[in-house]
């Protein structure tokens, strides 16, 4: 399904939080949405890999990587695990790598930047904890909507049919 964050903000601005504009799209999906699972980690992607091995249908993995621009938390191998387990997307407050392969995947991936250096695998990180970046506090089980224009967050799922109806009428 396609999502338009601009149209969603036109309808739900009082009900959503808008993440500061700092993310770029690296995945093969222009837009994605779902209920979030949060991870807080710094330059270590072992918990990310472990989490993405679970069923991700209807879910988005939101990673607070501390905004690190030194090591990539997502690479093609980890993204392929997410794609295989039907995750809708990944938002990384940090970096990705192997971007040419990421853009060919049926997966939404938003991140700050890309860098060729990979992350450590030391098992350090926290799962399903509140995280804060981009001027927004993210709670596990919130709903995220992302496209090339931006990222918005809602505590409840948004009625996408309203957005689709407005688009059809125009």
UniProtKB/Swiss-Prot annotation:
Pfam families associated with the record: RraA-like
InterPro entries according to UniProt: RraA, RraA/RraA-like, RraA/RraA-like_sf, RraA_gpbac
GO cellular component terms given for this protein: cytoplasm
Disulfide bonds: none
Source organism superkingdom: Bacteria
Predominant subcellular localization, coarse grouping: cytoplasm
GO terms (BP aspect): regulation of RNA metabolic process
One annotated GO molecular function: endoribonuclease inhibitor activity
Keyword field: Cytoplasm
Complexes and interactors: Homotrimer. Binds to both RNA-binding sites in the C-terminal region of Rne and to RhlB.
Function, in words: Globally modulates RNA abundance by binding to RNase E (Rne) and regulating its endonucleolytic activity. Can modulate Rne action in a substrate-dependent manner by altering the composition of the degradosome. Modulates RNA-binding and helicase activities of the degradosome.
Name of the protein described by the UniProt record: Regulator of ribonuclease activity A
Organism of provenance: Vibrio parahaemolyticus serotype O3:K6 (strain RIMD 2210633)
């Amino acid at each position: 399904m396609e999502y338009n964050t601009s149209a969603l903000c036109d309808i739900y601005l009082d009900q959503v939080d808008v993440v500061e504009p700092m993310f770029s799209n690296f995945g093969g999906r222009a837009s994605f949405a779902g209920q979030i699972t949060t991870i807080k980690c710094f330059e270590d992607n072992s918990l990310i890999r472990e989490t993405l091995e679970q069923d991700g249908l209807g879910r988005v993995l939101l990673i607070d990587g501390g905004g690190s621009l030194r090591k990539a938390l997502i690479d093609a191998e980890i993204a392929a695990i997410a794609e295989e387990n039907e995750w809708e997307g990944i938002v990384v407050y940090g970096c990705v790598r192997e971007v040419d392969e990421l853009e060919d995947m049926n997966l939404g991936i938003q991140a700050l930047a890309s860098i060729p250096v990979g992350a450590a695998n030391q098992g350090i990180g926290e799962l399903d904890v509140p995280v804060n970046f981009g001027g927004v506090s993210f709670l596990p089980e919130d709903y995220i909507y992302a496209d090339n224009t931006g990222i918005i967050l809602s505590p409840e799922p948004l009625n996408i049919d309203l957005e689709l109806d407005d688009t059809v009428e125009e």
